Structure formats: structure tokens, C-alpha cells
Swiss-Prot record:
InterPro entries: AceGlu_kinase-like_sf, Asp/Glu/Uridylate_kinase, G5K_ProB, Glu/AcGlu_kinase, Glu_5kinase, Glu_5kinase/COase_Synthase, Glutamate_5-kinase_CS, PUA. It comes from Hahella chejuensis (strain KCTC 2396). The lineage of its organism: Bacteria, Pseudomonadati, Pseudomonadota, Gammaproteobacteria, Oceanospirillales. GO terms for molecular function: ATP binding; glutamate 5-kinase activity; RNA binding. SMART domains: PUA (SM00359). Residues 294-372 form the PUA domain. It catalyses: L-glutamate + ATP = L-glutamyl 5-phosphate + ADP. This is Glutamate 5-kinase. It is an enzyme of class 2 (transferase). Its EC number is 2.7.2.11. Belongs to the glutamate 5-kinase family.
Length: 386
């Protein structure tokens, strides 16, 4: 099993080197790694994780944790030996267990002088545009403040099933939400193998591949184990979801000593799945190809010059007029005074708000609206020139 496969014309050492440079990681830790065989939290193990997470933070990595374990902790607190089958009982266990889960994370991070925050998400939070933007704004603010967000699904209020589908998918969506550079999925396997390593002694670990390489499909779907390769296809699917925003994914064994800090150092651990494009390229291409625009902004010559020559954000002061019934977060087109479309992007204000602040300096937005979402009408990260 020491043999490592490299699929396609990829250089693993070069690909791994990026882990030493990137600054925002979403790290998913599953129940098998956080609990004592599904019966309550493994506090010593959590302490070791936090030691590594704190070391990453000191090294300049912004960490977001997607944590399982609420149901298992709830079962322990309620004295239940078997996982319940009824949805309302699962939700009750999650509600009880979430208290202990968050307290445990908080206590461990407190040893390193770090603040934590609990974020509970549902599918609707990430499918509704306004709620998505609110969640993104809150998370990015917490990250900028140096707080470690602890994210889980809001199991107590979901109505269709107890889980998002799986926390791998949730972690990938969170990686897209916060525009993470890397998604780290910690599992009880060493990574993705070309064959089931439990029944094939000649199985080889895939060291690096493109996330969308179809050759991986058969490797990930050949077993039905609940915690092993049976869950590997969901991890592959999560890596493909994360790759849409340009994030690379590492699927790696969570019980490897100092696994997170060693990944940061570029050690060849686990399976590295690469996106087809860099994060900023993927986002800009998505913006350029987003055909359905909801409104139109006409810019003065100064704003056009700042956007095209300096790559700056679009401020309200540079906008001459607003047309359309768009809402915050929707796509709008930007035109110069001659009627040429020069850019498009995701707007930070509803149309009725934008009408009130066009031509106004950003520091006056709050006095006009009574609040301020952002100083920019369109942030440069959400803007693409045409």
C-alpha cells in the first residue's frame, strides 16, 4: 500500500506545495474520529485536533470546521445505546448533543486563547439567495475576526431527513460559500484507493488526480462499508462540488499523527483532488457565463476607468443610473455612457436601495439608508470585465 498513483499528467509535489501557501481551509471531521465508537465525544482526540487547528491558525491559515458528532453525544447524554430510527428522536438527540459538542470545541479552543462560534445551517440557508448571502457575510466576518466557526447541519429543524445527505456535502457547500482554497475531509481511511484495500493487498493509494477524472468513479463506489470506502463516493462527489469554485480537496486519514500540520508542510498524505481551474478563474468564468442579468447600471467615465485599468470595486459614487428590479446578490450588467456593456457582477443592494445611493460617497450610505451592507455596490471579487 506504499505505492501512490498519479492520474493524468500531474506532478504531486508541485500540487502539494500549494498547501503551504493557501490561507483558507474548510476541515470536515466525521463522527468516527470525534466519538468513542459512536458513544459520546472523544475529548482527548478533540484536544489533539484543536492543537493542530491552532497551529494552522498561527501559521496564517483561516480554519472553518464542519463537525459531526451531535447525535452521538446526544445519545450518550440521554443514555441511549442504539441509534434511534424515528426522525423526532434523532432530532431530539441532535438537540441535546449539539450543546455538548459546542461546549467541547469551545473548551479546547479556549486553551489556545481562540474564540469559537456555532453556525447551524439547513439546505434552505444555502439555496435561498438572501439567506446564502447573510450566512456568507456572517461567516466571512467571523473568519476576519480570527474566530473559528464550528459548523453543523441544523438537524433539529430539518423535515426531510436527519442529515444534509452527509456532512461531506455540507463541507463542500461551505467551501464554496466562504471561497476556501482547500477542503480537507478527514476520514477513517488513508485516502482513495484504486481497489478496496480491505480485500486487495495490492491496492494502491491515489496520490493526486483531477476531481472530475471519471476513472475515479469505479474506485470510489466498489464497497458498501458505512465508514470506509462505502462513504468514499460521497467524498468524491463533495470534491467535485468544491471544485466548482476552484477549491482543491484532500481526502486523508484522520488518525495519522499531526495530519493537518503535515499537510500544511506539503507531506504526501491522502488523496489530493484538484479542480480544473484556479479558484479566481472558476469564479470569473462563472460570472462571465451567467447569462441572466436582472438589471442595468450606467457608469460614469471615471468608474469605467477605475474598473478597467485598476481592477477596483464599483462604488455608488461612480454610478449614473439604475434600471431593473434586481435584489441583493443578483447579477446586473454595467454599461458605459456610450451604451457598451463593460462588466457584470453580483450587486450588494436591492434596486430600490441602489437608486437612493447612486452618485453618493460610500461613507454617506448609512445616513441615507439607515444601514450599510457593504461600501461597494459591486465588490471586485464579484465583478468580471467583458
Amino acid at each position: 500500500m506504499s505505492v501512490r498513483l498519479q492520474l493524468g499528467q500531474l506532478n504531486e509535489s508541485q500540487a502539494r506545495a500549494r498547501l503551504r501557501e493557501t490561507r483558507r481551509w474548510v476541515i470536515k471531521i466525521g463522527s468516527a474520529l470525534l466519538t468513542n465508537d459512536g458513544r459520546g465525544l472523544a475529548l482527548d482526540a478533540m484536544g489533539l485536533w484543536v492543537d493542530q487547528l491552532a497551529a494552522l491558525r498561527k501559521d496564517g491559515v483561516e480554519v472553518v470546521i464542519v463537525s459531526s458528532g451531535a447525535v452521538a453525544e446526544g445519545m450518550s447524554r440521554l443514555g441511549w445505546r442504539e441509534r434511534p430510527k424515528l426522525l423526532d428522536e434523532l432530532q431530539a438527540a441532535a438537540a441535546v448533543g449539539q450543546m455538548g459538542l459546542v461546549q467541547a470545541w469551545e473548551a479546547q479552543f479556549k486553551r489556545h486563547g481562540m474564540q469559537t462560534a456555532q453556525i447551524l445551517l439547513t439546505h434552505e440557508d444555502l439555496s435561498d439567495r438572501k439567506r446564502y448571502l447573510n450566512a456568507r457575510g456572517a461567516l466571512c466576518t467571523l473568519i476576519d475576526m480570527g474566530v473559528a466557526p464550528i459548523i453543523n447541519e441544523n438537524d433539529t429543524v430539518v423535515t426531510d431527513e436527519i442529515r444534509f445527505g452527509d456532512n461531506d456535502t455540507l463541507a463542500a457547500l461551505v467551501a464554496n460559500l466562504v471561497e476556501a482554497d482547500h477542503l480537507i475531509i478527514l476520514t477513517d481511511q488513508s485516502g482513495l484507493f484504486d481497489k478496496d484495500p480491505r480485500s486487495n493487498t495490492d491496492a494502491c493509494l491515489v496520490g493526486v488526480a483531477k476531481a472530475n477524472d471519471t476513472a475515479l468513479d469505479s474506485m470510489a463506489s466498489g464497497s458498501s462499508g458505512a465508514l470506509g470506502r462505502g462513504g468514499m463516493f460521497t467524498k468524491l462527489r463533495a470534491s467535485r462540488l468544491a471544485s466548482r469554485s476552484g477549491a482543491a480537496t484532500v481526502i486523508v486519514g484522520g488518525r495519522i499523527d499531526s495530519v493537518l500540520t503535515r499537510l500544511r508542510n506539503g507531506d504526501e498524505l491522502g488523496t489530493l483532488l484538484l479542480p480544473d481551474q484556479e479558484r479566481w478563474v472558476a469564479r470569473k468564468q462563472w460570472l462571465a457565463g451567467h447569462l441572466k442579468t436582472r438589471g442595468r447600471l450606467v457608469l460614469d467615465d471615471g468608474a469605467v476607468r477605475v474598473l478597467t485599468q485598476q481592477g477596483r470595486s464599483l462604488l455608488p459614487v461612480g454610478v449614473k443610473s439604475v434600471d431593473g428590479g434586481f435584489q441583493r446578490g443578483e447579477m446586473v450588467s454595467c454599461y458605459d455612457l456610450q451604451g457598451n456593456e463593460v462588466a457584470r457582477g453580483l450587486v450588494n443592494y436591492d434596486a430600490d436601495e441602489a437608486v437612493r445611493i447612486v452618485g453618493v460617497a460610500s461613507e454617506k450610505i448609512e445616513s441615507i439608508l439607515g444601514y450599510i451592507n457593504e461600501p461597494e455596490l459591486i465588490h471586485r471579487d464579484n465583478l468580471v470585465m467583458l
